[in-house]
């Protein structure tokens, strides 16, 4: 039975698992194992996981978070890139019949196909993960661009990156990543995780960020690809005005500049403003105005 052994995140059991399988941490995969059961339980609580939910986990490691998810979810599909960990997970998660471990790289995986293969329809879809710091942003953007409708995404990441995701317009942390994420989801930091609860200990603290499906989505831009190009380009040089960044993005010839000025006027945005002052809605309005002027 699952209750006969200490939970996987118990520091003594974590060490025993590492020793049994001769595991060392792969720096190239950004591996840090969490050894505080209360924090794991708080992550699951932040995702509000229930038996109605199918949950995807990225990078289960030795299964500490997976175990907590399995106790509450309908089913868990855990994607693990490190083939050394597959026999470990087969062992540590053997008491839980509602877990499937899939040997996949999240950035190369066909998530829609995996969801269709491993989950029965009729359940809410959530994603919970402790992401490697070095690849957090590419994974998040991959998920948001996938077209998959996640009810909730709860991710542990570097505190500084979490602050950027949840930042409000006009703050130092607000940037293209803030806009890209907040266009799709509502974001908030649930709590901070000190670096001392990891093995090996990272150099910085982490944060748990909760992304929830928007109850009221902003109006969609006429050209989503252009909208994303505009957002990225507007923050190209943070200290420069939006106008300077627009010229770098679209060109400085008189006709283009005139069209850009007209688009700014239509969107009711001042020429001298910096990108960090614009809301998601402002960027959508400006993108639509530029497209209408033939700039994309």
From Swiss-Prot:
Keyword check for Cell division: no
Major enzyme class: transferase
Record-listed E.C. numbers: 2.1.1.182
UniProt keywords, alphabetically: Cytoplasm, Methyltransferase, RNA-binding, rRNA processing, S-adenosyl-L-methionine, Transferase
Top-rank taxon: Bacteria
Keyword Magnesium among UniProt keywords: no
Pfam families for this protein: RrnaAD (PF00398)
Compartment(s) of residence: Cytoplasm
Coiled-coil intervals, chain numbering: none
Chief location of this protein within or outside the cell: cytoplasm
Binding-site positions, S-adenosyl-L-methionine: 32, 34, 59, 80, 105, 130
Known catalytic reactions: adenosine(1518)/adenosine(1519) in 16S rRNA + 4 S-adenosyl-L-methionine = N(6)-dimethyladenosine(1518)/N(6)-dimethyladenosine(1519) in 16S rRNA + 4 S-adenosyl-L-homocysteine + 4 H(+)
PROSITE patterns linked to this entry: RRNA_A_DIMETH (PS01131), SAM_RNA_A_N6_MT (PS51689)
Record-level GO cellular component terms: cytosol
Gene Ontology terms for molecular function: 16S rRNA (adenine(1518)-N(6)/adenine(1519)-N(6))-dimethyltransferase activity; RNA binding
Family label: Belongs to the class I-like SAM-binding methyltransferase superfamily. rRNA adenine N(6)-methyltransferase family. RsmA subfamily.
Function: Specifically dimethylates two adjacent adenosines (A1518 and A1519) in the loop of a conserved hairpin near the 3'-end of 16S rRNA in the 30S particle. May play a critical role in biogenesis of 30S subunits.
Protein name as catalogued: Ribosomal RNA small subunit methyltransferase A
Species the sequence originates in: Ligilactobacillus salivarius (strain UCC118) (Lactobacillus salivarius)
Gene: rsmA
């Amino acid at each position: 039975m699952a209750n006969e052994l200490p939970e996987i995140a118990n520091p003594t059991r974590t060490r025993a698992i590492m020793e049994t399988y001769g595991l060392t941490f792969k720096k190239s995969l950004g591996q840090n194992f969490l050894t505080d059961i209360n924090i794991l339980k708080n992550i699951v609580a932040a995702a509000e996981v229930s038996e109605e939910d199918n949950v995807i986990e990225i990078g289960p490691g030795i299964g500490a978070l997976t175990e907590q998810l399995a106790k509450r979810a309908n089913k868990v599909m855990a994607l693990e890139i490190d083939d050394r960990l597959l026999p470990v997970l087969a062992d540590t998660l053997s008491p839980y019949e509602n877990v499937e471990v899939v040997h996949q790289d999240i950035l190369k995986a066909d998530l829609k196909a995996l969801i269709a293969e491993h989950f029965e329809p009729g359940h809410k879809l959530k994603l919970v993960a402790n992401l490697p710091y070095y690849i957090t942003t590419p994974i998040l953007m991959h998920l948001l661009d996938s077209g998959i409708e996640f009810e909730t995404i709860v991710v542990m990441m570097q505190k500084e990156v979490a602050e950027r995701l949840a930042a409000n317009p006009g703050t130092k942390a607000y940037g293209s990543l803030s806009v890209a994420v907040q266009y799709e989801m509502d974001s908030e930091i649930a709590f901070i995780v000190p670096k001392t609860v990891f093995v090996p200990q990272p150099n910085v603290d982490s944060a748990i960020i909760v992304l929830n499906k928007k109850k009221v989505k902003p109006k969609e831009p006429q050209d989503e690809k252009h909208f994303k190009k505009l957002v990225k380009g507007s923050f190209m040089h943070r200290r420069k005005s939006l106008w300077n960044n627009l010229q770098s993005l679209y060109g400085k010839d008189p006709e283009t500049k005139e069209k850009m000025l007209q688009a700014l006027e239509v969107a009711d945005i001042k020429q001298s403003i910096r990108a960090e002052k614009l809301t998601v809605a402002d960027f959508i309005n400006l993108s639509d105005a530029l497209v209408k002027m033939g700039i994309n």
